[in-house]
UniProtKB/Swiss-Prot annotation:
Name the UniProt record assigns to this protein: Proline-rich protein 14
Gene behind the chain: PRR14
Biased composition, class Low complexity, residue ranges: 200-214, 398-410, 538-548
Region (Required for nuclear localization) location: 519-536
Subunit structure: Interacts (via proline-rich region) with GRB2 (via SH3 domain 2). Interacts (via N-terminus) with CBX5.
Origin species: Bos taurus
UniProt function note: Functions in tethering peripheral heterochromatin to the nuclear lamina during interphase, possibly through the interaction with heterochromatin protein CBX5/HP1 alpha. Might play a role in reattaching heterochromatin to the nuclear lamina at mitotic exit. Promotes myoblast differentiation during skeletal myogenesis, possibly by stimulating transcription factor MyoD activity via binding to CBX5/HP1 alpha. Involved in the positive regulation of the PI3K-Akt-mTOR signaling pathway and in promoting cell proliferation, possibly via binding to GRB2.
Gene Ontology BP term (one): muscle organ development
Residues where Phosphoserine is found: S277
InterPro entries to which the protein is assigned, alphabetical: PRR14, Tantalus-like
Acidic residues composition bias: residue spans: 572-581
Compositionally biased intervals (Polar residues): 1-11, 314-325
Region Required for nuclear lamina association, residue ranges: 136-365
């Protein structure tokens, strides 16, 4: 389908952007191979090329301004036994001002052709393509062509390389370079015949196309902005020395080509693991400082860790370094920090508190708050020594080592040396006590560990309550029985026939005995003896089988049994004899 205003001959070949391998690809080979050979594009690649063609068509359609094409005259040239045609279009009429709107686009996208706006050097009418596995740069265009013809997406861009002002109709003109898209598929090569030596461009190629020399031939000048005289064919192939005018558009189209090719032509990539984040280092430094005297704020304070006890004792014996320092009345397990001084390596003595009030920072109150004594210094560890007090002896103050200025923490022996002096009065007490007592005082070793569990007490109930104490007596008088606190008079339902039973009156008559069967004798067992346990059900069953010895037959009963058996036998014999005598009478 021709563009609007096309007056060219119907048999003229056109530059078409169509992704299907149809009209222009099989000129040399009339029949397409049925089987897909090695190196042929896969269906995924074909689909991606179609998508690229549609996207580029939408991008460039709004900026395309068609010209009325002129008649062409072709001059044949022979190079490497192949024919290349150079078209020349003399502009016979001024360009039209009508824009090609998107509504006037041809309905058939498969045969969409865009006429070039200039006399450009076309690729050969039957471009040769060869699929190979390892493309080499030294491959000549005269090499024989493979039978497989693959469609290549061709984007036509043209640079308006002229310093003259543009015509009004070319305000939105799109560039027209012939750029084969070979971004993501290195196996598909486009071979074009080289121009003769006399037509080679003298100046260097532009910087925009130098990165892709095989895919972008040199552009052609614009014939519309030139004088109407027909230039020689050699000048048509030579680019002009002028900057590129539409380089940003070219880069945008190229970036879209690359992005679509990366999406549709690259295989699935394994997800890369995120780069390992650098480990976080948390450093917590706690410095205990106090507001010093006015005028000494420019000094620095260094906090020293707790020195070992051996260092305290070693320096405790050196009285030359002792200086008076008032105690602050706080826990003696934390170091005593002096005020900052000009020398960071020494701990100057603290002067005695003067009578004048000490100025306090960040206070808005009156003189009462200013006269109040300063609070004790903060303590990081809560340890209290029993012998430490407020009025104890002053601690020792020494100078730090010479390496304190280079290190972050110095180690003076001053902290908590007052506690060592407070421990001195306790030393003679420890010497008076023997070694055996000092080892056992306040230790767990003095408690004996029982190897066997303690026996449970008998006079306790299962709940742990004490049992009532009973007298070990076998005979009780009636007074003791009835005066016992545990005695209760029998109720009407629970009455016993005793000598003290009171008669009850029923229906006007006195009843001395009850109608219930009551036991006349009561056996009082000794309470000191343990009660006999009731036999279990299994024991009762076994006891029923074997007679107890009290119920066992005595030897006197045996002759009685024998006599009884003999009597039974005699009676049986008599009955038999009587039966024998009655039988003959019946016969």
């Amino acid at each position: 389908m021709d563009l609007p205003g096309d007056s060219s001959t119907p048999g003229r070949q056109r530059l078409c952007r169509q992704p299907h391998a149809g009209a222009l690809w099989g000129a040399k080979s009339p029949k397409r191979p049925k089987l897909q050979p090695l190196g042929a594009p896969s269906p995924l690649e074909k689909a991606s090329r179609r998508v690229l063609a549609v996207v580029l068509e939408d991008v460039m359609a709004a900026r395309m301004v068609p010209l009325e094409p002129q008649e062409e005259s072709s001059t044949p040239r022979h190079h490497s036994n192949h024919r290349d045609s150079v078209r020349s279009q003399p502009p016979a009429s001024p360009p039209r001002q009508a824009m090609w709107s998107p509504q006037a686009r041809p309905p058939d996208p498969l045969h969409l052709c865009r006429e070039p706006l200039s006399r450009i050097r076309r690729p050969p009418s039957t471009p040769r393509r060869q699929s190979r596995t390892t493309p080499g740069p030294d491959e000549g265009p005269s090499q024989k062509v493979d039978q497989v013809h693959q469609p290549t997406l061709v984007v036509m861009l043209q640079d308006i390389a002229s310093s003259r002002p543009r015509a009004e109709g070319f305000a939105d003109e799109a560039p027209n370079f012939i750029i084969p898209a070979r971004r993501a598929e290195p196996k598909v090569m486009v071979h074009q015949p080289k121009p003769p030596s006399r037509d080679l461009p003298a100046p260097s190629r532009p910087s925009a196309l130098s990165a892709n020399p095989l895919a972008s031939p040199p552009p052609a000048p614009d014939p519309v902005l030139e004088p109407p005289s027909t230039p020689p064919p050699s000048s048509l192939l030579r680019p002009r020395l002028s900057p590129w005018g539409l380089a940003p558009l070219f880069h945008s189209v190229r970036s879209k080509l690359e992005s679509f090719a990366d999406i549709f032509l690259t295989p699935n990539k394994a997800p890369r693991p995120p780069p390992p984040s650098p480990p976080m280092k948390l450093e917590l430094k706690i410095a205990i400082s106090e507001a010093g005297q006015p005028g000494a704020s420019e000094g620095t304070v260094t906090v020293s860790p707790r020195p070992p006890i051996r260092q305290w004792r070693a320096q405790d014996q050196n009285p030359s370094a002792t200086l008076t320092k008032p105690s602050l009345g706080r826990s003696h397990s934390c170091p005593d920090l002096g005020p900052p001084g000009p020398d960071p390596c020494s701990w100057p003595p603290v002067p005695a508190p003067s009578s004048r009030p000490r100025p306090r920072r960040h206070t808005v109150g009156g003189g009462e708050m200013a006269k109040a004594p300063p609070p004790p210094r903060p303590c990081l560890r809560k340890e209290v020594f029993p012998l430490g007090g407020v009025g104890a002896s002053p601690p020792l103050v020494t100078s730090c080592s010479s390496t304190a200025s280079t290190s972050s923490f110095s180690e003076p022996a001053e902290p908590r040396l007052s506690s060592t002096k407070r421990k001195e009065p306790r030393a003679p007490e420890d010497q008076v006590l023997p070694d055996s007592e000092t080892k056992t005082i306040g230790k767990v070793s003095r408690f004996r560990i029982r190897r066997t569990p303690a026996r449970s007490q008998i006079n306790l109930t299962p709940m742990g309550l004490p049992r009532p104490v009973r007298l070990n007596k076998k005979e009780f008088s009636l007074e003791e029985i009835y005066t016992n606190k545990n005695y209760q008079s029998p109720t009407t339902r629970r009455t016993f026939e005793t000598i003290f039973e009171e008669p009850r009156e029923r229906n006007g008559t006195l009843i001395f005995t009850s109608s219930r069967k009551l036991r006349r004798t009561v056996e009082f067992r000794d309470s000191s003896l343990p009660r006999s346990r009731r036999p279990s059900r299994g024991a009762r069953a076994t006891a029923g089988r074997t007679l107890p010895p009290s119920l066992a037959p005595s030897p006197d009963v045996e002759p009685l049994l024998q006599q009884r058996l003999q009597e039974l036998d005699a009676s049986l014999l008599e009955e038999e004899e009587e039966g024998d005598q009655d039988q003959p009478h019946r016969t």
